């Protein structure tokens, strides 16, 4: 009987876990839908901003004999000072979502250091912060809460310090790493060079001439302002993209956990019925044996 009670207790415990994981799956699914909508709206704004940068950059490129000469576009093929910004979640229970970002960030650190570059790490998200602190890796910046609730103002304040560092020559390159959303079942690691802006990614030779009239002396000022806004929006969009990926990863993890719990309950029920049958058989044998001994 003690064995039956133990199995019954396990069944009850697993069923409670199943209810919890299923509830977490439903919550993540609802949050994912909201984050997807936010990501769609953000992509439209980012595309328009990129178009403006392309148009102004093209105008400056054609106007100058030296081509596009702007601090935000000056590529350094052998950077000696690199800032890596990486985004992880504040919470776990989302499969390999955090570990994949941490793994790629660690690889990038090793790659840059092998080329003689000094790397500064800027972390967003508790899981990444905890990992590197545990491994005694110095973090130049660490923010908790922003990856769970992306905020444009806060993310802009965070990145403005890094941009200032770039303008002052304290860093040669700024790279952003995060786990991005592809669809409800797929996430992928994304690496974006934030600064300097990769001119090869801009369609400078194919964009149409802008109808916007800008004084030549204002071109550089306007481009600087647009690039800064572009950088601010890049980090904000990455936070949204990462959050969507986190929700989809957690939804998958909780779905798998719910299915596993269901299988465990099924196996435990079989085990319980078998043990109960054995207990009944034992009792019958004892009764029959007792009756036989009384004859």
From Swiss-Prot:
InterPro entries: ATP_synth_F1_ATPase_gsu, ATP_synth_F1_gsu
BP GO terms, sorted: proton motive force-driven plasma membrane ATP synthesis
Superkingdom as given in the UniProt entry: Bacteria
One GO CC term, this protein: proton-transporting ATP synthase complex
Gene Ontology terms, MF aspect: ATP binding; proton-transporting ATP synthase activity, rotational mechanism
Subcellular location(s) of the protein: Cell inner membrane
Keywords, comma-separated and alphabetical: ATP synthesis, Cell inner membrane, Cell membrane, CF(1), Hydrogen ion transport, Ion transport, Membrane, Transport
SUPFAM superfamilies hit by this protein: ATP synthase (F1-ATPase), gamma subunit
Membrane topology of this protein: Peripheral membrane protein
The protein's assembly and partners: F-type ATPases have 2 components, CF(1) - the catalytic core - and CF(0) - the membrane proton channel. CF(1) has five subunits: alpha(3), beta(3), gamma(1), delta(1), epsilon(1). CF(0) has three main subunits: a, b and c.
Function: Produces ATP from ADP in the presence of a proton gradient across the membrane. The gamma chain is believed to be important in regulating ATPase activity and the flow of protons through the CF(0) complex.
Family statement: Belongs to the ATPase gamma chain family.
Protein name, per record: ATP synthase gamma chain
Organism name: Sulfurovum sp. (strain NBC37-1)
Gene name tied to this protein: atpG
């Amino acid at each position: 009987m003690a064995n039956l009670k133990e199995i019954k207790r396990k069944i009850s415990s697993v069923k409670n876990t199943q209810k919890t994981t299923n509830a977490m799956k439903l919550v993540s699914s609802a949050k994912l839908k909201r984050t997807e909508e936010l990501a769609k709206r953000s992509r439209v704004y980012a595309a328009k901003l990129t178009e403006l940068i392309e148009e102004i950059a093209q105008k400056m490129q054609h106007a100058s004999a030296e081509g596009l000469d702007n601090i935000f576009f000056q590529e350094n093929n052998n950077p000696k000072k690199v800032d890596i910004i990486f985004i992880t979640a504040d919470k776990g229970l989302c499969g390999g979502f955090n570990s994949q970002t941490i793994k790629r960030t660690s690889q990038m650190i090793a790659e840059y250091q092998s080329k003689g570059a000094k790397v500064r790490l800027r972390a967003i998200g508790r899981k990444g912060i905890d990992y590197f602190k545990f491994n005694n890796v110095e973090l130049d910046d660490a923010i908790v809460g922003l990856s769970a609730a992306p905020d444009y103002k806060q993310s802009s304040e965070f990145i403005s310090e890094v941009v200032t560092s770039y303008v002052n020559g304290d860093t040669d390159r700024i790279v952003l790493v995060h786990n991005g959303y592809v669809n409800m079942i797929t996430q992928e690691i994304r690496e974006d060079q934030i600064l300097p802006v990769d001119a090869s990614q801009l369609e400078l030779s194919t964009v149409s001439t802008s109808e916007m009239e800008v004084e030549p002396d204002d071109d550089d000022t306007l481009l600087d302002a647009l690039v800064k806004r572009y950088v601010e929006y890049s980090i904000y969009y990455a936070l949204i993209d990462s959050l969507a990926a986190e929700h989809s990863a957690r939804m998958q993890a909780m779905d798998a956990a719910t299915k596993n719990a269901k299988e465990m309950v099924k196996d435990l029920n079989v085990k319980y019925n078998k043990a109960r049958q054995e207990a009944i058989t034992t009792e019958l044998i004892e009764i029959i044996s007792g009756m036989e001994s009384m004859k």
